[in-house]
Amino acid sequence: IDYTFVSQVNNNLISNAIRYATSKVNITYTSNNDGFYLSVSDNGCGFSKNILSKATNPYFTEEENHSEHFGLGLYICKILCEHHGGYLKIKNCSIGAKVTAFFKSLD
């Protein structure tokens, strides 16, 4: 597993969760024979239904101020996961959202 990729995705997902959380962020790391899972969830407002499918598109952001956030974070996370044979999964929870990154083992 390329830990540079994992670190980049980790930092981005945590940064996003902190930005949108009301007060709580959960981070879970799991590994098995298939690979490595990184899940980050928050208790923010989650993704609206029409946004959920667009969240990993390049340059997509809900924020009106594009000077700080260019809408590339989740897109880059998705590309890094896919480059490593994995995926990025985004879902809404009863409160907030959860993003799971999977990196396939290269063994």
Predicted regions and their residues:
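Short conserved segment of the HATPase_c
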Residues: 47-60
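Conserved polar catalytic motif of the HATPase_c/GHKL fold
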Residues: 11-12, 16
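Conserved micro-motifs of the catalytic ATP-binding
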Residues: 1
